[in-house]
């Protein structure tokens, strides 16, 4: 039945409902780690500093094999539920680290996931704020960060929404309200059912109407992040910098079902103040395999000051940073965990160091690592070629093109080492960013970003150029 709806419609069992509430509040009792599943393995992706997993000596890259008496190899349920419970509850686990069996006892404690995990004064007057989710605490934490930074001397702000997947709509509106007057329309929702049509306006007096503001977005900024970026862009209140956002502009509502379960269904779409639709996928247009296609239209709209902006799925930045886009090869290396696993190996090779900077020698080792391990690197070109062959088979012409297909596929695969070399700097950067979290946790990662990322440097450059801000935000 769910397949007849859009891909974002999902059934929540009782545990999923609890997890959804945790995402909205940012609070739970657990081990304090990000957990992922890959090829049947339960992997610790990131350890949160000073929480239970960290205190028990667990590290990113550890593979959990058993929780109490439950062996996880064939465990199909959500493993995170086994790692939650009452405060101070003790859990015995077994795990693999670099191929060796180990054990640990974890004493659960309360985990507080910050909506604003990091903020910093850059130089003498630029405030930098990372906003990673839109939970019930987002506006409160953002406001506190702004006031703290202003007390330190900040007269300009960077709001970093990169890779923020969204969250509560009301919090997105309230974040905008920090910078725009009361009664401004931030977002409207439109549905085929009239009662689901809504207009969301700012309701409070603003915190600061004048402070120069830049907003950072990327292709993983979605939903509530896009409402903030699109709303402040349409109101000419902030310069949006980075790369085009994800394009998730669907309003979803949880509907209660029996036995504590829910189904989250799509009821309407988001529209920015200028009238732009954020949604990228058009479910009325599907390809041969039944997948929804990205909208191709680029309709023109006007901001409050009369600037031209466009819809077509996602928010386009005022200032694009093409060099910040991840290459197809880098995406493939992230997807197959090559970057993550090599970083784990490199960390243990240099575990006694307080920090580590990836060298050219390490990059050569990475190339050898790719050669010696069975990593499937499926680039965009290879995916398109595979799609072509699927169509050829459907049309019964595959036998006529198979030889050329095999030649092209072999050429793409044989070109991997050359592509690695071409993307050397990007790959080294990704390994560095993964490594820094092993040594310095998330705080160290954010500090590293401030010092090294071109996106943040571009924001500072724009903020230090009032004439450029005026020109960008004017008709």
Regions found by a protein language model. Give the residues of each.
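Short, conserved catalytic or interaction motifs in soluble domains
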Residues: 33, 49, 69
């Amino acid at each position: 039945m769910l397949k007849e709806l859009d891909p974002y419609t999902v059934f929540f069992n009782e545990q999923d409902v609890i997890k959804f509430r945790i995402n909205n509040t940012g609070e739970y009792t657990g081990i304090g780690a990000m957990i992922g599943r890959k090829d049947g393995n339960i992997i610790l992706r990131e350890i949160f500093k000073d929480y239970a997993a960290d205190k028990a000596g667990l590290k990113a890259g550890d593979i959990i094999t058993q929780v109490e008496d439950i062996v996880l190899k064939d465990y199909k349920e959500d493993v995170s539920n086994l790692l939650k419970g009452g405060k101070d509850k003790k859990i015995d686990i077994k795990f693999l680290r670099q191929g060796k069996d180990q054990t640990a006892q974890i004493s659960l404690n309360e985990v507080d996931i910050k909506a604003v995990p990091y903020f910093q004064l850059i130089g003498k007057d630029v405030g930098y704020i990372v906003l990673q989710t839109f939970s019930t605490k987002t506006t409160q934490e953002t406001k506190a960060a702004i006031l703290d930074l202003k007390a330190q001397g900040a007269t300009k702000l960077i709001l970093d929404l990169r890779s923020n997947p969204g969250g509560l709509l009301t919090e997105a509106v309230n974040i905008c309200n920090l910078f725009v007057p009361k009664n401004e329309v931030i977002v409207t929702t439109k549905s085929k059912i009239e009662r689901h049509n809504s207009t969301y306006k700012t309701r409070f007096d603003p915190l600061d109407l004048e402070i120069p503001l830049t907003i950072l977005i990327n292709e993983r900024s979605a939903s509530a992040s896009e409402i903030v970026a699109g709303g402040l862009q349409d109101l000419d209140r902030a310069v949006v910098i980075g790369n085009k956002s994800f394009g998730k502009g669907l309003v979803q509502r949880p509907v209660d079902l029996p036995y504590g379960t829910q189904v989250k269904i799509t009821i309407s779409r988001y529209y920015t103040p200028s009238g732009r639709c954020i949604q990228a996928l058009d479910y009325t247009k599907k390809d041969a395999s039944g997948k929804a296609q990205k909208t191709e239209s680029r309709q023109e709209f006007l901001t409050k000051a009369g600037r031209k902006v466009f819809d077509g799925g996602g928010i386009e930045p005022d200032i694009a940073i093409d060099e910040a886009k991840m290459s197809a090869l880098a995406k493939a290396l992230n997807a197959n965990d090559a970057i993550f696993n090599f970083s784990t190996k490199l960390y243990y090779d240099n575990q006694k160091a307080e920090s580590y900077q990836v060298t050219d020698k390490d990059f050569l080792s990475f190339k050898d690592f790719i050669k010696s391990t069975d990593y499937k690197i499926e680039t965009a070109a290879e995916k398109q070629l595979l799609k072509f062959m699927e169509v050829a088979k459907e049309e019964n012409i595959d036998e006529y093109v198979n030889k050329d297909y095999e030649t092209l596929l072999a050429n793409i695969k044989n070109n991997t080492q050359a592509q690695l070399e071409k993307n050397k700097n990007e790959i080294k950067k990704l390994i560095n960013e993964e490594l820094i979290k092993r040594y310095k946790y998330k705080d160290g990662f954010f500090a590293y970003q401030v010092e090294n990322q071109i996106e943040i440097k571009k924001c500072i450059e724009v903020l230090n150029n009032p004439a450029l801000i005026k020109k960008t935000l004017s008709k």
